[in-house]
Amino acid sequence: TAMKNKTWKFALICSLIVMGFTACDDDDEYYYVGGGSSWLSYGNLEKIDNGSRSKFAIRRDDGNRLIVTEGMPINFDGAKEDLRVYVNYSIVGSERDETGLEGNMNYYIRLYGFDDVLTKVPVKQSFINEDEEVRQDSIGNDPINVREAWFGGRYLNVEFRIPVKDGSKEKHFINLVQDDVVAHNDTVYVTLRHNAYSEKPDTGNDRGNYSWGRGRVSFDLTSIVPEGQTSVPVKLLWTEYGKNTSETVNREDSGTYTLKNTGETGENKGLNQDKSKMVATEEVSECVIE
């Protein structure tokens, strides 16, 4: 189907850039930048018709809405309803959102910058098994280091790192595979997969010519919740590099994924748990979505 084919066509192209984050608050989705004067958030574009200088507002994963009144307008050609974005902004005002019943807020913001975020749906293991030799190789088995993983809105958000050859434009493919073949009681098992193709630090004579590349992806998990249910336990699996790129380590984390707007919160543990974090200034490659 078109949806299945689309899963294989997303690519990440890495280019070198220096990123520095100073500190963050207690919510996994929102980071403070520049001494607490601005924020970094995930959200989706939402059409707005209120005389705003932007054609779109941003609906954060917590349901609150960001309305641009200063700074960069969101009027670029690729802007569309529900486009997922990662935004840098400061809040200049707020009021209660009277358009809904959820008690959300409207935050009026000065927008400094934004990127669109790679969004995908899980690939089912049964689909891979239909042509296992080709699809298993295409989806990849290369390590991927998970920096952060959490549920936000209808998504599993993952911020990750991968080794990138200095100056390379090699494409990397990222997917999430749902195990629908082996039963795991009530828990849904998903595995983060990475295909680095020829860009592997332990091959050839280029072992030392690599830097860490940073990327982000959001997986829409609504399809993994069984019919008639509003939430499901989830176990996330991945393989990452150890202390050096010649070692690999199997990792896992778990939590409860709850459908949006059901009124349920699920049990706050693992991937659902808010936790205080410090993000230090580091020199890494930023993986840009194509």
Q: Which stretches of residues belong to each language-model region?
A:
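Bacterial Sec-dependent N-terminal signal peptides
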Residues: 3-8, 14-48
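Short aromatic-glycine-enriched beta-strand elements
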Residues: 46-58
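Beta-strand/loop nucleic-acid-binding surfaces
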Residues: 62-78
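Short beta-strand elements
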Residues: 243-290
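Short helix-loop boundary/capping segments
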Residues: 139, 143-208
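Surface-exposed beta-loop interaction hotspot
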Residues: 95-161
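Short, solvent-exposed, Trp/other aromatic-anchored flexible loops in extracytoplasmic proteins
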Residues: 78-80, 197-243
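Flexible glycine-rich surface loops and low-complexity tracts that mediate binding to linear polymers
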Residues: 77-103
